[in-house]
UniProtKB/Swiss-Prot annotation:
Residues 28-118 are annotated as: Disordered. It is linked to Variations in PRNP are responsible of transmissible bovine spongiform encephalopathies (BSE), a class of neurodegenerative diseases that affect various mammals. These diseases are caused by abnormally folded prion proteins. BSE can be subdivided into at least three groups: classical, H-type and L-type, with the latter 2 collectively referred to as atypical BSE. Susceptibility or resistance to a BSE disease can be influenced by at least 3 factors related to the host prion protein: protein expression levels, number of octapeptide repeats, and specific polymorphisms. It comes from Boselaphus tragocamelus (Nilgai). Glycans are attached at N192, N208. It holds the Pfam family Prion_bPrPp. Cu(2+) 2 binds at H80, G81, G82. Keywords: Amyloid, Cell membrane, Copper, Disulfide bond, Glycoprotein, Golgi apparatus, GPI-anchor, Lipoprotein, Membrane, Metal-binding, Prion, Repeat, Signal, Zinc. This is Major prion protein.
Length: 264
């Protein structure tokens, strides 16, 4: 008997709890429905809970409430409200609002100044070094270098060089190192094309070079061509080593396994 009573009370308690949960789910939220005491929109002033923007407390179409098209409210098209297109509100396109489109607010406006565009001349100038020079048969122009300090064996030439070194080139023309069998061929070709181009360009501007200038220019350009060859050779061998490393079977298998783990 005791067990049967206990079971009955447990059943009754379970049914009561289930019914209470069902009622809680069906119970309407306060002030959330249409035409109820609450409002569906935040920031409305009336307790009537209409469906339109912030109003002053009257019903629809009244002169002093907050209804549609009224002179004293917060609705659409009013002169003293917060509706759309008004002169003294916070709506769209107003001169005295806060946050609307094109207003005097500080955030979210569409009339911000556009960002300055990148000057393409600066981009082209930055990409000039190391690029293939048109009209020179595949020669490239190296980066600017400091002109080396060279001693020519006598005071006159040393002084002449120091006084005129600014007239000599600080960049050299060259072809890729893989087109030459050794450093001497690279340097000889580099010196010839660089001195020729610099002489022609400078002569066109009305400045002539003497035999002493040509002699010193060849010595200066030779040193710069040697430096250019060493730089290009090191970069070439590094690229070749990278290709060999990533083409080896163990590395290929490792990369394939990592890709399989990421994709899978």
């Amino acid at each position: 008997m005791v067990k049967s009573h206990i079971g009955s009370w447990i059943l009754v308690l379970f049914v009561a709890m289930w019914s209470d949960v069902g009622l809680c789910k069906k119970r309407p939220k306060p002030g959330g429905g249409w035409n109820t005491g609450g409002s569906r929109y935040p920031g409305q002033g009336s307790p009537g809970g209409n469906r339109y923007p912030p109003q002053g407390g009257g019903s629809w179409g009244q002169p002093h409430g907050g209804g549609w098209g009224q002179p004293h409210g917060g609705s659409w098209g009013q002169p003293h409200g917060g509706g759309w297109g008004q002169p003294h509100g916070g709506g769209w396109g107003q001169p005295h609002g806060g946050g609307g489109w094109g207003q005097g607010g500080t955030h979210g406006q569409w009339n911000k100044p556009s960002k300055p565009k990148t000057n393409m001349k600066h981009v082209a100038g930055a990409a000039a070094a190391g690029a293939v020079v048109g009209g020179l048969g595949g020669y490239m122009l190296g980066s600017a270098m400091n002109r080396p300090l060279i001693h020519f064996g006598n005071d006159y030439e040393d002084r002449y060089y120091r006084e005129n070194m600014h007239r000599y080139p600080n960049q050299v023309y060259y072809r890729p190192v893989d087109q030459y069998s050794n450093q001497n061929n690279f340097v000889r070709d580099c010196v010839n094309i660089t001195v020729k181009e610099h002489t022609v360009t400078t002569t066109t501007k009305g400045e002539n070079f003497t035999e002493t200038d040509i002699k010193m220019m060849e010595r200066v350009v030779e040193q710069m061509c040697i430096t250019q060859y060493q730089t290009e050779s090191q970069a070439y061998y590094q690229r070749g080593a990278s290709v060999v490393l990533f083409s080896s079977p163990p590395v290929v298998l490792l990369i394939s396994f990592l890709i399989f783990l990421i994709v899978g």
